[in-house]
């Protein structure tokens, strides 16, 4: 049976490639998705790669993943620092959860230093650009034996 991985992306990540490229790089979210799809195929994973600017939609996808996925990779974006709802939804999931950030949030503004997600995540990757998604997928594959 094929295992499913959810990669969830929060607000403004749909603007990757054009929004603050000096911080987030020139790759688009579609570029990152294509890279992740290729990697997932190699590990035999089915991929649900999703983005929303809306907190409730992200919570709905997390709840869906609870019963259908082997792991979640999430870039909560700005919701990292504000969303107890996303944190609570993730904490109800009994699977590996990886928090990914394109930039090093700890080298940026002070309000970005706190994450509601980090305490319940299996691992946190920040500052590696899109390679953070690759690293999270490789670790997930190792953890679930894919």
From Swiss-Prot:
Enzyme class, UniProt record, top EC level: lyase
Keywords from the UniProt entry: Amino-acid biosynthesis, Aromatic amino acid biosynthesis, Lyase
List of residues binding substrate: 75, 81, 88, 102-103, 112
Domain of life: Bacteria
Site (Transition state stabilizer): 19
Pathway: Metabolic intermediate biosynthesis; chorismate biosynthesis; chorismate from D-erythrose 4-phosphate and phosphoenolpyruvate: step 3/7
Active site: 24 (proton acceptor), 101 (proton donor)
A single GO BP: quinate catabolic process
Protein's UniProt keywords contain Transmembrane: no
Stated family: Belongs to the type-II 3-dehydroquinase family.
Protein function: Catalyzes a trans-dehydration via an enolate intermediate.
Protein name: 3-dehydroquinate dehydratase
Lineage: Bacteria, Pseudomonadati, Pseudomonadota, Alphaproteobacteria, Rhodobacterales
Gene (UniProt): aroQ
